[in-house]
């Protein structure tokens, strides 16, 4: 199934630096929708609220966690589609994102607060179309913050992957129920 850009669901993930959580969420959602044959129905991106990592590639542990865990989450064919993960370049969230995306998912309360501050001063807030919420509101068992694994070890990245994957499976169920 193919959708023109007008009918695509446009999803943006936002964390602090755009090298760990939001990048991981972008990768996971791309994998899930590719595996279901609906990648063309989505426009998926990620950004950070800070400027710390603009232009940087994903944290190597993000890439490693996705490579280790995606195989059990998506089809082998879809996994081949993601050899370009390290080509991602971090970018900063901008006020234009409010009018470009249908869904803007913050990884935690701090990210959500920063997004709302940008919205308050946005020159595009009158054209604001996005639903803004924490991705963790889609968690199966309880609403969570997707914790930043940056200062942790691989186990923290794998926990992050599991939370992101769980939330996105539930988000897709909601999207499918609306169609």
UniProtKB/Swiss-Prot annotation:
Q: Which InterPro entries match?
A: LMW_PTPase, Ptyr_pPase, Ptyr_pPase_sf, Tyr_phospatase_low_mol_wt
Keyword Nucleotidyltransferase in record = no
Q: Which residues of this protein are catalytic?
A: 15, 21, 148
* Cell compartments where the protein resides: Cytoplasm
Q: Recite the UniProt keywords alphabetically.
A: Cytoplasm, Hydrolase, Protein phosphatase
Q: Which reaction does it catalyse?
A: O-phospho-L-tyrosyl-[protein] + H2O = L-tyrosyl-[protein] + phosphate; a phosphate monoester + H2O = an alcohol + phosphate
EC number(s) from the headed UniProt entry = 3.1.3.48, 3.1.3.2
An example GO CC term for this entry is: cytoplasm
Q: What class of enzyme is it?
A: hydrolase
Q: Name one GO molecular function term.
A: protein tyrosine phosphatase activity
| Domain of life, per lineage | Eukaryota
Q: What is its main location?
A: cytoplasm
- The keyword Hydrolase is annotated on this UniProt entry: yes
Main role? Acts on tyrosine phosphorylated proteins, low-MW aryl phosphates and natural and synthetic acyl phosphates.
Which family does the similarity line name? Belongs to the low molecular weight phosphotyrosine protein phosphatase family.
Name the record gives this protein? Low molecular weight phosphotyrosine protein phosphatase
Question: Per UniProt, what is the name of the gene that codes for the protein in this document?
Answer: acp1
């Amino acid at each position: 199934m193919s959708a023109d850009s007008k009918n695509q669901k446009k999803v943006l993930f936002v964390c602090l630096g755009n090298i760990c959580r939001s990048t991981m969420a972008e990768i996971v959602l791309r994998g899930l929708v590719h595996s279901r044959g609906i990648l063309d129905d989505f426009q998926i991106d990620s950004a950070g609220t800070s400027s710390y990592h603009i232009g940087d590639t994903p944290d190597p542990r993000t890439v490693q966690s996705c490579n280790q865990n995606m195989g059990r989450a998506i089809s082998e064919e879809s996994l081949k589609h993601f050899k370009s993960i390290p080509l991602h370049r971090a970018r900063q969230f901008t006020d234009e994102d409010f009018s470009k995306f249908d869904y803007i998912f913050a990884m935690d309360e701090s990210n959500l607060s920063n997004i709302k501050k940008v919205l308050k001063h946005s020159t595009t807030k009158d054209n604001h179309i996005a639903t803004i919420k924490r991705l963790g509101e889609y968690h199966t068992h309880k609403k969570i913050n997707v914790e930043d694994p940056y200062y942790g070890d691989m186990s923290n990245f794998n926990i992050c992957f599991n939370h992101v994957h769980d939330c996105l499976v539930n988000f897709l169920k909601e999207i499918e129920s609306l169609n």
